[in-house]
């Protein structure tokens, strides 16, 4: 994928789920294109390794479902970066892959706590820093599962549908304030999150993609990096697909 030198010059970003997968890929591109990044992730060891690898300015090991931890991290990262222009919410889990009537209640709640409540906490605590400067770009990671629903993935599908609705509301609230908020709705792409799923579920999701393959993390990262840039200036409260033709709405 191409690197656009200077696209993020002077810009400062917070990336959740930044130690691996899409979050790491996006953070690396923002840094390569002139920006500064604070990484948030639950995995402290992976976070330290990624910081050393991509030269991130600041890191915070936290659970995004802990509101107090997110509030503290937002203040610490804003201080370390000097400001916050960009928020990429990429932290998430898949949960169990079973029918609704067999879904463990605690597992369902955990998926909602991380994928939806945690994303809300991150947006809630970071947006005020953007409003102070009259500029911001927010990318919340949703999924085609939030549009269509995947069988045996009710918690994940529900959480991502919530992210889409949440982001549409937020984008409208921020319209005219210099802060743009959109959601990415990818189909399944190669990333560590697939390790949480049985191969049968991965095969099912691949079969739904007209292009006949899983996406590459670099492909979704390229879309996110457009969404998080100044170039994305007249689209807000919307969704961007990287689905290989699976969804067209």
Swiss-Prot record:
Biological process, per Gene Ontology = rhamnose catabolic process
Q: What is its EC number?
A: 1.1.1.401
The record's listing under InterPro entries reads:
NAD(P)-bd_dom_sf, Sc_DH/Rdtase_CS, SDR_fam
Quote one Gene Ontology molecular function term: oxidoreductase activity, acting on the CH-OH group of donors, NAD or NADP as acceptor
Active site per the UniProt annotation:
156 (proton acceptor)
Pathway(s) it belongs to: Carbohydrate degradation; L-rhamnose degradation
**Which catalysed reactions does the entry list for this protein?**
2-dehydro-3-deoxy-L-rhamnonate + NAD(+) = 2,4-didehydro-3-deoxy-L-rhamnonate + NADH + H(+)
Q: Which Pfam families match?
A: adh_short_C2
Q: Which domain of life is it from?
A: Bacteria
Alphabetically sorted, this entry's keywords are: Carbohydrate metabolism, NAD, Oxidoreductase, Rhamnose metabolism
Q: What class of enzyme is it?
A: oxidoreductase
Family under the similarity heading = Belongs to the short-chain dehydrogenases/reductases (SDR) family.
Query: What biological function has been recorded for the protein in this entry?
Result: Catalyzes the NAD(+)-dependent dehydrogenation of 2-dehydro-3-deoxy-L-rhamnonate to form 2,4-didehydro-3-deoxy-L-rhamnonate. Does not show any detectable activity in the presence of NADP(+). Catalyzes the fourth step in an alternative pathway for rhamnose utilization that does not involve phosphorylated intermediates.
**Self-association state and partner proteins as the record states:** Homotetramer.
Can you name this protein? 2-dehydro-3-deoxy-L-rhamnonate dehydrogenase (NAD(+))
